[in-house]
Amino acid sequence: MYQTLQAAYAAKRKARRFAVQGIYEWQMSHNPVHEIEARTRAENAMHKVDLNYYHELLTQVIAQHEDLDALLIPVLDREIDALDGVELATLRLGAYELRDHLEIPYRVVLDEAIELAKHFGGADSHKYINGVLDRLSSTLRSAEKQQAK
């Protein structure tokens, strides 16, 4: 049971990694999402990835990026256009999970986003990601945050 749970968490973590890369690619190139997904699946070993979650994150974050940006803008300390591309992709993914995946504890969403930023982002981008998503979670997950205190 424990190993099955660990494997499921690892598969979701890998899905997030591939999704943030695909979101970043879309932001830079505006290539069609289905092309990004097809290329990613063809060029990578995806057998230990939660493919359904990867597909959902990639397609839904891109499809809903304007709504996600509207959630992020009030908690940013700079213009959204001034964000690094990796930071923006990570923030969009984190905002999507905070808003649409209430079954995932907000602290897990923050931790996963921090790990993505450490892996793909600049030296201190993980601190920025943490601060922005923590502020956003105060709005989207206020009851959950109050219970956690």
Curated annotation (Swiss-Prot):
InterPro entries: NusB-like_sf, NusB_fam, NusB_RsmB_TIM44. One of its GO terms (molecular function) is RNA binding. Pfam families: NusB. SUPFAM superfamilies: NusB-like (SSF48013). GO terms for cellular component: cytosol. The keyword Glycoprotein does not apply. It comes from the Bacteria. GO terms for biological process: DNA-templated transcription termination; transcription antitermination. Keywords: RNA-binding, Transcription, Transcription antitermination, Transcription regulation. HAMAP family: NusB. Involved in transcription antitermination. Required for transcription of ribosomal RNA (rRNA) genes. Binds specifically to the boxA antiterminator sequence of the ribosomal RNA (rrn) operons. Belongs to the NusB family. This is Transcription antitermination protein NusB. The lineage of its organism: Bacteria, Pseudomonadati, Pseudomonadota, Gammaproteobacteria, Moraxellales. The gene is nusB.
